[in-house]
Every structure is written in C-alpha cells, then in structure tokens.
Amino acid sequence: MRVLALLLAASGVASATDVLTHHNNLARTGAVLEEKLLSPATLKNQAFGRLFSVVVDGQIYAQPLVVTGLAIPGKGTRNVVFVATMRNVVYAFDADNAEPEPLWHVSLGAPMPYDRIPKDGGALLGQYNVRPYIGVTSTPVIDRERQLIYVVAKIAEPQCPGAEAATAACPVVYRIHSLALSTGTIAHRSDIRIPMTAPGISAADVARRHLQRAALLLANNRVYAAFGSHQDAPPWQGFVIAFDAETLHQIEPAFCTTPGGEMGGIWQAGNGPAADDQGNLYVMTGNGSFDPGAKQFGSTFLKLSPGLTALDWFAPATVGDLNLLDIDLGSSGPMLMSDTEEIVGGGKDGKLFVLQRSKLGGLQQHHWPHDRLSPPVQFFQAARPWRITLLSWFPFLFNAGYHHNHGSPVYWNSRLKGPTIYLWPEEDNVRAYHYDERTRFKTKALKGMMGNKGMPGGFLSVSANGQDDGILWAAIPYMDDAWVEIVRGTLRAFDANTLQLLWSSDGNEPADNFDFAKYVPPTVANGKVYLPTFSDRLNVYGLHAPNATATPKAASNLSKDPRHRGHVKGASGHARHGKN
C-alpha cells in the first residue's frame, strides 16, 4: 500500500479529488475528471482488485464520500472516506489503508425497525423492501469550507423494541445533523417538520410514512432534503425542505409537490436534486395528483428557486397514464449536462427526456418522437421492451411495456466520442448515447453487456483524466432480482468509449462475494473505487502494488449475519414499485 501511495504522489493524484456530494457535483453528472491512475490500460495491464474491506454496523444505502488531506486530531493528516449506515452510524475511515478501526464513528440514535410502517394498502403487495432497520437512507453532503458533513437520520425515540417485536407504539422523528469532519462531534442538529396534515395522523405518523431517500443538496448556503413515501403507505406527499447550513434552522416554507392532493414523492432512486449555477433546483416526482392550476405536480420535472418556489415544470403527454399505472417519472433523478442548457432524465416507461433548463415547457402536447412543435427538446425510448411473455401482452396492468430506468444517467465528454451519457436500465444492456449540439442525441445506443434478471439495473460513475482514459463503473446485482430480496452484487468496469468489459469483481475475484447495495453508485477517487454493500462492509478496490499478491485484506472479521445470503433468487414479475 505504501508503494501505491508513492505512485499516487508521483502522478500528482495525492491531493487531487474530493467527492463531497452524490454523483460528484451539483449537476449530478457522476463523473470525476481528475483520475490519473485508473485507466483502461492500467486495468488491462496491472493487477486491479479488492484491496481491503472495512466493517460497519448496518447496510449502506448512501454513496461514500471522500475528503483528502484532512487533519485528524492525534492521527495526523489523512485521506478519509465517510460512510453512513441504516443503523444510524456515521464512520470516518482512512481511505487508503486497511486499518481495523475507524478514525471516528458516531451513533445518531436508534433506527426505526422496518415493520413500523402501516400496512394499510400501501406496503408494496405485503412486501417490505427496506429491512431490518431504517436509519440514514440518503447520501450526506460535505461542506469543506465549514468542515462539516450533513446527515439526515430516521430515529426511533425512545428506542423501539427490535424488529421482531409486535408493538406498533414507536415514536419516530427525522433529524438533520452537522458533524465535524475531523472528529464526528455534533455541531448542530434539528428535528425536521414535514408539513403535512391529515385527519388522525400525528407528526410521528407523518415521519413514519415518509422516506428521505434522495441525496442531500448543499447550495445557496442551505441544505436541501427531499421526501417521498415509505412503502407507499398513505397518506403521504412529496416535499423539499431547506435548512440554514450554519445553524440547521428549518427555513419556511417548505415546497410540497401536491398541495391539497396526494403522493408526488421525490425519491429518485437515491439520486439527489440537481442545481444550476444560479442556485435553482431540479427534481423529478413520482406518481401523484396532477393539476398545474392547483400546483399539483405528480410525475413532473420541476425547477425550483433557491427559496423553493416553482419556477417552471414539464410533464409528459402521458402523465395521466403514468400516475394511474404506477409508471413513475421520478424513478431516477435529473442530470444537468455540462456546458449545455439541457437537463436529462427518465423513469419507468424507459424514455429519456431532454429539456431546456431555461424553458422546461409545461405539459407536452404530443408524444410522437419526431414532433418538434412542443417541448421537450428531444425524447426517445432508451430501454428495451419486455421479452414476449404473458405480462408483455398486458402492459396497462404491469407498468407499461419497457424496462425501467432507476439510475440517473451519467455524463462524460470524451475526446474520441464526444459528449456521451450512460445508463443501465433494469434487465437490459448497459447503454451509451452520443450527443451532438445540433441534432441532440443519436437514439441508436452503443450497447454493452446484459444486466441481471429484474430489478433494478446498474448504478454508474465515470472516471477519466479530463477527456481521456474514461472508465464507466457499474454496481449491479450479479444475477438475481433485487426488488425485495437481498442478492449478490458485482462491480464492473467498462471502457467508456467502447463499453468493452475491462474488469469484473465476479470474473476476477471469485472470493469477492458481497450483497448488492440497491440504488447506490460506486465512488471513484484518487486511484481507488469505494463500493458500498448490504453485507455491512465497504469494499475498497484499486491497483495492487508491483509484485504484490492480489489477496484482499479485511480490516476486521466480516459480518456473519444470516440475513446476508450471498445470492438469493428474487421475486419475479414486473408490477413493481421499488421505492426504497
């Protein structure tokens, strides 16, 4: 590892890259463009693999974040990777070395047992797809200037009995925290008031029925947290809530996606709200009431001011069908294409919409792909149709006829291929779409390997040295459907220009068996790849030192929790919500 550190220093990488937010930046491009060590050539010609793992308490639903050159009291200056878990524990680990103990860790309170969600018609056909605890489900965000990390946790107060207990008396609160980067000391914390009222529903019930799944956003000297449903247990609505970044005072008013209506959650499969250079926010909503005159925006792209006023919106011509048939537009999040005015996003119907940020366009008047008389700028089918099965003959009953998009597109401007977006829909090939500023996207995809059976597709990041040496990294189930079950996962690396497979954890590391972390992309920084898992551990990959064996090191004994089943055959079928 010390030899590798010298290589990093020699290549100018040692202080290069921080990853402070989900998908690397406020545009949510998913690209790190200062990677000088990892390239298609080094992955082909050198020993790349798992270097070590660190054990944590709980599943990891949040993307790991990285800070370089951080002074830790009594432990020197370190590169640090931050991990938050579903047991409400936040960790700071040495990002480069397999140390058995974290630099610091802090518990934010007892998590909520999974079975505290009401089953009044909304528990996903009786299935719980988040279990056994619900704690930190969103990716935190880091303010390097203030030396703080912001984290939202779902907390049971007082501590609830274990998930196996029968009682439903479980006070629940959402709480936002700011922690000192160097020590984990809590600087501020504040209970979150989700401003929903309904007959017979207490504040604890409101917190219980909502899920803060989308990554946090730091912009405009504020921290923004978006909410959707937990298990679709009504009543619930979508919200964006802002907090002062210094004090965590909740700033009123919050934004509700469906005032006077219902649903319209912002979950985005964990992807965060995006923000432009003016501080405006962009989100995508799921199924819900749609009446623009009443400011109800189910299955809609929304542009919000820094003060959370709706500035503009776009809804597909089929918005009524999307809402009726559970074909969420907001099953992934928006991505702002760098150096353009365009925003890209898509949902369960497998389409990608390309919109102009300065004029989203309102309600689409037609839905023929070649109609240019009304917004969007472009839209096209970006996921393949279902195979010919009984389900495919009845698309109106089973989420329409195309495989769903869950991971937001990621973007890289290749010197060889030009601007390109990548996505990996469920049960589909990994795909690349090339962009021309005059004609927009070429709708014939460059396709790579096929994905797993069923939910949820692949979750992507791009590393590159500017416009060169691009690698597309993907976290995806190894084989089985991860709609409800915990299944084996794999990490794959592709040449970003050709989609040729360069490396795979299941092909090159036969002993690298871990549980897939649903909806979470890998983090790439400074020659390493940080992969969260549901096996209660963070895996760290990189180039092995010259002449070193490729045997991975474990920071401590890995969890033997019987809940981690390696690979388990998942539930079948296509009528899936998958909001977790």
Give, region by region, the residue ranges found by the protein language model.
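N-terminal signal peptide c-region/cleavage motif recognized by signal peptidases
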Residues: 10-14
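Polycationic, low-complexity disordered segments in secreted or periplasmic proteins
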Residues: 551-580
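Mobile, glycine-rich extracellular loop/lid and propeptide segments
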Residues: 17-305, 309-362, 406-413, 420-433, ...
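N-linked glycosylation sites
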Residues: 547-549
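Extended C-terminal subregions enriched in glycine
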Residues: 451-452, 463-465
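Short, contiguous acidic/charged loop-to-helix segments that flank catalytic cores in large enzymes
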Residues: 396-400, 445-452, 478-485, 508-513
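Sec-dependent signal peptide recognition
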Residues: 1-7
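A glycine- and small/hydrophobic-rich beta-loop-beta segment
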Residues: 339, 351-451
